[in-house]
């Protein structure tokens, strides 16, 4: 049995026509990091599984950025799994103690992320065990190698053949109660009263699991449906033990502002410079030197060599994590459109909490020009720009507002 220790969820703070959408500096990977940090804020995971159908990079790798954003060391194993709702449930059911399973969606229908941290077997709380699985083929929606999407457009076929007939093949007993279903309507499988998310999505499975746990519903079945594939798992409770910890990074939604991007060529990428800056920039670390004449112990960001009192170049330093909260020291807004950067946008000098370090960062999560001097907030992973097709990730400052607090 898989033991659920903690759950984290993330929703972007923007909407378009009442549907959550990502900001221009977000993608599936930044959302995955937000959900993962919510589930595992102390960075205890020793294995990470990322499940999505919307990887930012199919070649080039997403794992290094994912681990850095989660504050996990580079020797932690990362698996990138292409799949939807059933794949997420399968990965959770097969996970071992200390595994962080992250599901993220960046599609036309769902933009969200969620994560589950697996605990030790027998630790109590909420447990999941496999019940049945059916993998069939009814490609009512397909996406080709070039990204072209085709939809057959027959909801009745999807409901009758894709969902109902596949659920029948599971052979579930009449005594087994369905408490949550993702990818189908509860009434389509005679599961009235179950928590439902008709949109099939990777993150929806974990969000449904969190809803069942929060409602303290009696144990029952969780169904994950994608087209004509279904995985069923049984949720059980160990009475008298504490429920899994659930953290939701879900700021109140606001209408997505209008952005413009100028035509032209943006700043080209230099991969040697990218490689040199990756560790301190993405791991959010500063250089700290041992005190000697001419050199103090104040953290230096970005890390760099220093000159001692005798004129010698000192390069021996250790890297220490920087705080992920701070306040706006000063700020300004750029309204002239430039290539590669959706405008307008704000930049701010952030005074990090409990540190002498001040960092120049873009502002995220609020409309341009809204951040004010002295406003507190969090440092979060964002996609700064796309340079020659390579996502250039870094950190941005998300001001704390009345609608949402500090982010992990």
What residue spans do the PLM features occupy?
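OB-fold/S1-family single-stranded nucleic acid-binding modules
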Residues: 380-408
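Condensing-enzyme catalytic core mediating Claisen C-C bond formation in acyl metabolism
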Residues: 1-30, 108-169, 173, 216-271
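Conserved catalytic cysteine-centered active-site region
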Residues: 22-26, 30, 54-98, 186-211
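Short, conserved beta-turn/loop elements at beta-strand boundaries and strand-helix junctions
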Residues: 331-337
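OB-fold (S1/OB) nucleic-acid-binding surfaces
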Residues: 340-359
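Short nucleic-acid-contacting surface segments enriched for D/E, G, S/T with interspersed K/R
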Residues: 364-379
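Phosphate/pyrophosphate-binding loops at sites that engage ATP/ADP/AMP, CoA/4′-phosphopantetheine
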Residues: 35-47, 160-178
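Cys/His-rich short segments
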Residues: 264-330
């Amino acid at each position: 049995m898989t033991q659920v220790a903690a759950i984290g969820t993330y929703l972007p703070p923007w909407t378009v026509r009442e549907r959550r959408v990502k900001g221009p500096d977000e993608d599936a990977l930044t959302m995955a990091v937000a959900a993962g940090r919510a589930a595992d804020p102390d960075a205890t995971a020793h294995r990470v599984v990322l499940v999505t159908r919307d990887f930012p990079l199919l070649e080039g790798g997403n794992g290094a950025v994912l681990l850095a954003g989660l504050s996990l060391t580079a020797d932690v194993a990362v698996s990138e799994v292409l799949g939807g709702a059933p794949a997420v449930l399968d990965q959770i059911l097969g996970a071992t103690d200390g595994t962080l399973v992250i599901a993220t969606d960046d599609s036309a229908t769902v933009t969200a992320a969620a994560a589950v941290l697996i605990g030790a077997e027998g630790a109590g709380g909420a447990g999941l065990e496999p019940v049945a699985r059916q993998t069939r083929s009814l490609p009512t929606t397909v996406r080709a190698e070039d990204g072209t999407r085709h939809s057959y457009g027959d909801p009745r076929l999807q409901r009758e053949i894709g969902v109902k007939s596949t659920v029948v093949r599971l052979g579930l007993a009449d005594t087994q109660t369905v408490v949550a279903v993702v990818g189908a309507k509860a009434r389509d499988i005679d599961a009235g009263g179950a928590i439902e998310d008709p949109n099939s999505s990777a993150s929806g499975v974990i969000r449904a699991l969190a809803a069942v746990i929060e409602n303290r519903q009696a144990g029952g079945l969780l169904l994950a449906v994608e087209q004509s594939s279904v995985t069923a798992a049984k949720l059980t409770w160990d009475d008298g033990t504490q429920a899994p910890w659930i953290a939701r990074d879900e700021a109140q939604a606001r209408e997505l502002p209008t952005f413009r991007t100028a035509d032209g060529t943006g700043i080209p990428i230099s991969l040697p410079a990218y490689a040199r800056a990756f560790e301190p920039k993405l791991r959010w670390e500063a250089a700290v030197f041992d005190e000697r004449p001419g050199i103090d112990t104040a953290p230096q960001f970005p890390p760099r060599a220093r000159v001692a009192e005798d004129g010698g170049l000192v390069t021996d330093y250790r890297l220490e994590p920087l705080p992920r909260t701070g306040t706006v020291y000063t700020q300004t807004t750029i309204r002239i459109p430039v290539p590669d950067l959706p405008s307008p946008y704000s930049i701010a000098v952030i005074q990090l909490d409990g540190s002498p370090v001040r960092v120049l960062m873009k502002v995220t999560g609020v409309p341009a020009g809204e951040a004010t001097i002295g406003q507190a907030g969090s440092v979060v992973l964002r996609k700064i720009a796309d340079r020659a097709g390579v996502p250039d990730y870094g950190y941005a400052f998300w001001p704390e507002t009345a609608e949402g607090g500090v982010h992990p």
